């Protein structure tokens, strides 16, 4: 994979950088700037090299048209504060404002183009439409650096097509992500434990199938666990359940048994009367969830058991929270897993926190990011990497 060094002398050159600034917002306030901070090493490196840096990124899911609610204005402000230099924000993606903003840059300056998903060609399934937008990007720059790991699984104009038109390289963040994930997937030090959470089994089917041939232990929590419990014949009350996945999960349980992979499920659940922060709740056995209750976290016994398995592993990958960590009453399971990972890291294990929700949980629960070997910025991208899929935005950088 080509690196920034392979691009040669950059002073005076205009470099287009695809970053991942898809940060959570409360109105216009950024509630977690982790993805912006993760982009800083690459951007600072290009600034120090004297390049004119033009950043493109998306935020949220606007419907292919400008929408003030998804403007990158808060991102430009925060990025400027973190870089210690003003960041000019173009009022459009590749239009007159973008051209004026880029033309006004001096060596070492940084500009941000408006939300790339305001242009419907970015995510078009039509190759010609995407290429048209990519050509417009290429007119603005001399080289392209791909540094938005969270989008490398998408065949989009600013991720894939533009790399076919300009001298290109992987940014420092993308290189760090690929290096960390390869270490966990290609030749993991054993025991190798994978913790999977989040709401849906269907989002993790490919990952589970692939990991059943690689991991030593799979620990399952989050909303997806109720489909596993149902597959074992248990009643799960009003908990999240994907009935159409029960047979698939039964197959995974059988396959795990045959291949010697241990699947660890919670033995107790925090069950609530409703999905609410202040809902009355109780700890119940995982096979005795009341019919009128909804499971919102793994229980304390399970949290301790999961953490013990994690502490005994040499490689740990965690993707997805154990419960509704945004509500204090249902955050203990996620906190126990996070603590287990930091303990394992301190004991010399290689640990990866993957997925947007897991990374957000780690930060919101007050854990020091330095307590983990690697915190991935890619949700879907890291999942597809763990599945063993070819990611278009990475494959194009090999050419």
Curated annotation (Swiss-Prot):
Subcellular location: Cytoplasm
GO BP terms, alphabetized: gluconeogenesis; glycolytic process
Entry EC no(s): 2.7.2.3
Top-tier EC class: transferase
Recorded metabolic or biological pathway in which this protein acts: Carbohydrate degradation; glycolysis; pyruvate from D-glyceraldehyde 3-phosphate: step 2/5
InterPro entries associated with the record: Phosphoglycerate_kinase, Phosphoglycerate_kinase_CS, Phosphoglycerate_kinase_N, Phosphoglycerate_kinase_sf
Main location: cytoplasm
Keyword Kinase carried by entry: yes
UniProt: ATP binding residues: 204, 295, 326, 355-358
Entry keyword annotation includes Iron-sulfur: no
Catalytic reaction annotation: (2R)-3-phosphoglycerate + ATP = (2R)-3-phospho-glyceroyl phosphate + ADP
CC per GO annotation: cytosol
GO molecular function, one term: ATP binding
Top-rank lineage group of the source organism: Bacteria
Positions of substrate binding: 20-22, 35, 58-61, 117, 154
Alphabetic keyword roster: ATP-binding, Cytoplasm, Glycolysis, Kinase, Nucleotide-binding, Transferase
Family designation: Belongs to the phosphoglycerate kinase family.
Subunit structure: Monomer.
Name of the protein in question: Phosphoglycerate kinase
Organism: Beutenbergia cavernae (strain ATCC BAA-8 / DSM 12333 / CCUG 43141 / JCM 11478 / NBRC 16432 / NCIMB 13614 / HKI 0122)
């Amino acid at each position: 994979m080509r690196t920034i060094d392979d691009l040669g002398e950059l002073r005076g050159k205009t470099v287009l950088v695809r970053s991942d600034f898809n940060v959570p917002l409360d109105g216009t306030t950024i509630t977690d700037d982790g993805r912006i901070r993760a982009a800083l090493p690459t951007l600072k490196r290009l600034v120090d090299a004297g390049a004119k840096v033009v950043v493109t990124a998306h935020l949220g899911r606007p419907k292919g048209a400008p929408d003030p609610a998804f403007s990158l204005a808060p991102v430009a402000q925060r990025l400027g504060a973190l870089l210690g230099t003003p960041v000019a924000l173009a009022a459009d993606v590749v239009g007159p404002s973008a051209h004026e903003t880029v033309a006004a840059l001096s060596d070492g300056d940084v500009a941000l183009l408006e939300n790339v998903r305001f242009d419907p060609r970015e995510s078009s399934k039509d190759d010609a439409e995407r290429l048209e937008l990519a050509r417009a990007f290429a007119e603005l720059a001399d080289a392209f650096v791909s540094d938005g790991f969270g989008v490398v699984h998408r065949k989009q104009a600013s991720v894939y097509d533009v790399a076919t038109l300009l001298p290109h390289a992987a940014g420092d963040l993308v290189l760090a992500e690929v290096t960390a994930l390869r270490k966990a997937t290609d030749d993991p030090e054993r025991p190798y434990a994978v913790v999977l959470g989040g709401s849906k089994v269907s989002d993790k089917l490919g990952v589970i199938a692939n990991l059943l041939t690689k991991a030593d232990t799979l620990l399952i929590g989050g909303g997806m666990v109720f489909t596993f419990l149902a597959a074992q014949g248990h009643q799960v009350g009003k908990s999240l359940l994907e009935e159409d996945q029960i047979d698939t999960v039964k197959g995974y349980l059988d396959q795990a048994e045959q291949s010697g992979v241990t699947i660890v499920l919670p033995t107790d659940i925090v069950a609530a009367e409703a999905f609410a922060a202040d809902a009355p709740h109780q700890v119940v056995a995982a096979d005795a969830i009341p019919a009128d209750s909804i499971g919102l976290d793994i229980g304390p016994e399970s949290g301790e058991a999961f953490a013990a398995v994690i502490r005994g592993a040499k490689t740990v990958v965690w993707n997805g929270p154990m419960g509704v960590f945004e509500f204090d009453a249902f955050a203990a399971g996620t906190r126990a897993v996070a603590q287990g990972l930091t303990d394992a890291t301190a004991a010399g294990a290689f640990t990866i926190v993957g997925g947007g929700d897991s990374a957000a949980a780690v930060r919101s629960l007050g854990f020091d990011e330095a307590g983990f070997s690697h915190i991935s910025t890619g949700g879907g991208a890291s999942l597809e990497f763990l599945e063993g899929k070819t990611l278009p935005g990475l494959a194009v950088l090999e050419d």
